[in-house]
Structures are given as structure tokens and as C-alpha cells.
Amino acid sequence: MATRPLSPAQFSRRPRFLLRWYYWLLLAVAVAYGLAFAMHWDDRGVLWVQERFESPAERKESVWLPDYHAVIDGKLLPGMEKDEASDLAYNPQTKTLFSVMGKNPFLVELTLQGEVLRKMPLMGWSNPEAVTVMENGLLAIVDEREHLLSIVKVEAETRELHRDAFPKYDLGPSEDQNKAFEAITWDPRNQQLLLGEERPAALFSWKSDGSQTLTGSKQKLVNGELDVRNLSALAIDPRTGHTLALSADSHLLLELDEQGEQVSFMTLLRGFNGLSKTIPRAEGVTIDDAGNIYMVSEPNLFYRFEKQ
């Protein structure tokens, strides 16, 4: 039986159908890419694959962020709704936390449960964005806007701090002057301060013996470029020497080994690691000597994570 040829009407409908299908496919791809970009799946995909290659022994010797679960989830820091929590640091001597507020400059001391113990105005600071605890009651504070690092002394009776009373160090220019040094942590093993530029994310070191005197000048780390959209904060795990690097824009917390290689990560989105809501803008992270992790987010949210 002979095959009946397509009529002109049928022939014209087929290309139009194929064209519509092609446009719908392009739209679906564009939507999927936009969703992946917005949810930062592009950041996490490679990290997840890298995690699969870590051996059980390597996981045991690391912080291993996938095992952490939020036990304090977005607790409000009272009276700080308009102050913009910018960083967080653990003090092993007092077993308390210190946080800097960037919008209205002050230093606050917190319990490990996020209760406020005292607030200390930071007189002379313009935009304090990073803080770390060093030795003997010393804290290093970074003013991002003025590119200055100050090393201050905080004692039990301290009620306010005046920047001009303490040593200051010029951090120099940044590739993006408006997205300069926003992260700092004390590295006691290597006797240095570890500094982080926000964007493009990069790590620097500055030698120190833990006193108010820094040696030489800051040095950019060869392996200090991070594959995140920005760098918000840094912390050093006192047990392993590994670095925690926080990115607010990527909604990620990374664990890096002492060679700067990524070991594990935590995603800061709702439904992951016990979070009931996405952390809106994580700006500070620290870890205590028991391995508990603490974070602050703008405007005034407090988080505590414990290993399960």
C-alpha cells in the first residue's frame, strides 16, 4: 500500500511544533540555570564530589562539617536589631564569645548560649568588620572602611575602647577598595594572624607572637584563593589546625586543611544541618576547644552547631 504524502498544512505544522519545543527547552534550561545560580548549586556541586573522596580516617581527623546540627537556630541578640553583627570570636580563657557590630561600632561579649554579658563602645572605629582573640586578653579588630588593624586589650573591667590608645597597622589597598579585609583569625600553631579579603576572596598571613607587635608585613598565601563568591569570616580549629572559611554570598562554610585544600563544607540553607530557615547573611564564625561552632548573621541572629 502506498504511503500517502504529507499535505502542505501538515508539513507546515511540524516545523512550528519543533520550533515551539526548542523555545520551551531553552526556557527550561535558562530557568534551571537561574535557580542553580540563585541557590548556589554551582558552588556546592564540585565541593560535594570532592567530599566523596575523603577516607574515613581523613574524616575522623578533620572537623567534618556534614556531621554538624544546629542546636541554637537564629536566636535574636536583644537590643541589636539595627547594629549588624559582623564577626564572632571564641575566648578560651573566659569561655565566652566576642562579636563586633559594624553599623553602630561596639564590641559585645556573649555567653556560649548567645546571652549578652556586656557591650563596649568602639570609639574611633568607622566600620569594624572582623575580630579575633589572641593571647593574654588581646583582641585584633579590623576596620574594613579604613583598612586598619588594631590590637586592643580587653579586661574584666573594660567598658569602652578608644582606638587611639592601641597599636594600629595599615592593611594597605585592596583590589576592590569597598570589599576589603573583612576576616581575621589568630593562628597560634603558626604564630600568625590569618586575614581574608572579601572580594575577590583571598587569604593573607601576618607574623605575630600573640602580642601587640606584628612582624614584617602581610603576605598573600600562594594557595589562598577561595572558590566562593565572597569571604565573610575565618576561624581556626584549635584541635586540628584546620581553617573555617565563611561565605555569606555563597551560603557556605568551608573547612580547609593546613595546605589550604578543601576538606568538607556546610550549606547554610533551610533544611540542611538542622536549620529551620536559611541563614540570611552569615557574617561571623568561630569554633571552641570542644569543637562547637558558632555563627552570627545580620542583623542580629545567633547560631550554635554541635557535632551529632
Each model region followed by its residue ranges:
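Sequence/structural signature of beta-propeller domains
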Residues: 2-308
